[in-house]
Amino acid sequence: GCRYMFGDCEKDEDCCKHLGCKRKMKYCAWDFTFT
């Protein structure tokens, strides 16, 4: 499944909807989208 906020990630696709991977810190964070 997808990674939630602050979950480990390698790329944006690893994260749940509305989350993007912060490559520098290697965690999922909100990508500023609502839809």
From Swiss-Prot:
Pfam families: Toxin_12. Keywords: Disulfide bond, Ion channel impairing toxin, Knottin, Neurotoxin, Secreted, Toxin, Voltage-gated sodium channel impairing toxin. Transmembrane segments: none annotated. The keyword Disulfide bond applies. Negative results: shows no or weak effect on hNav1.8/SCN10A, rKv2.1/KCNB1 and hCav1.2/CACNA1C, hCav2.2/CACNA1B, alpha-7/SCN9A nAChR, alpha-3/SCN3A nAChR. One of its GO terms (cellular component) is extracellular region. One of its GO terms (molecular function) is sodium channel regulator activity. The presence of a 'disulfide through disulfide knot' structurally defines this protein as a knottin. Disulfide bonds join 2-16, 9-21, 15-28. Belongs to the neurotoxin 10 (Hwtx-1) family. 28 (Jztx-11) subfamily. The keyword Secreted applies. This is Mu-theraphotoxin-Pn3b. Expressed by the venom gland. It is found in: Secreted. Gating-modifier toxin that targets voltage-gated sodium channels with a preferential activity on Nav1.7/SCN9A. On Nav1.7/SCN9A, the toxin acts by shifting the voltage-dependence of activation to more depolarized potentials, whereas it does not cause significant effect on the voltage-dependence of activation on other sodium channels. Minor effects are observed on the voltage-dependence of steady-state fast inactivation for all sodium channels tested (Nav1.1/SCN1A-Nav1.8/SCN10A).
